[in-house]
Amino acid sequence: LQDAAIISHYFPNLSDKQKKQFAQLGPLYKEWNEKINVISRKDIDNLYVNHILHSLAIAKVIQFKPGATILDVGTGGGFPGIPLAILFPESEFHLVDSIGKKITVVKEITGAIELDNINADQIRAEQLKYKYDFVVSRAVTRMKEFYGWINTKVKSHSSHDLDNGILYLKGGDLEEEMDELKKRYKLYDLTEFFKEDFFETKKIVYLPVFN
């Protein structure tokens, strides 16, 4: 399974609208990637596994509630924010990146698939004035630096099964990197959720901010 069918395989309860939106992403990213490079050229054929399904790993760890607010930092072409926003249409997503061209792509794609629970802005995370329930990201920097940018952007009151904090998609050996932060965290191996080879070294780092 290499197209949108793989999403339905792992998330069997999608609505018709969600299935359509996921199916639209393939052609849209191919089209936009030729104009503005948001995914490496050799990787665009692996879009559904390496980018969309990878983003949705977060949904295997937490179910965002209606009204929840989620910040996606360094979203690039819209990952993990766009796939998560499709999956959780009643939650609110704010996608930010310091590179304007990437935000242009995010806005064009969300408009094309009529995804109305996303705001996208060209801004650095540390300049944001709001607070969110969760911050999500795909490995934009070492966790210690990332934590420094966003630890003041998380609401203290939690209404989810997990305390409010960071959900970070990252690969490789994370122990040394996490030890330098000296905070309590939990790792989830993505092989628990998905069987594709791509996920063998991939993890989610969950870091509650208030403890």
Locations of the language-model features?
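Class I SAM-dependent transferase core
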Residues: Q2-P66, L71, K101-I118
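Conserved SAM/SAH cofactor-binding pocket of Class I
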Residues: L56-S137, Y147
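Conserved beta-strand segments of alpha/beta enzyme cores
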Residues: E92, N117-N119, G165, K186-D189
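Short glycine-rich anion-binding loops that position phosphate/pyrophosphate groups of nucleotides
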Residues: A139-R142, L174
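A short, conserved alpha-helix within the catalytic core of class I
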Residues: M143-K153
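Conserved beta-strand signature within the Rossmann-like core of class I S-adenosyl-L-methionine
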Residues: S158-D173
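Active-site capping/gating segments
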Residues: D173-N211
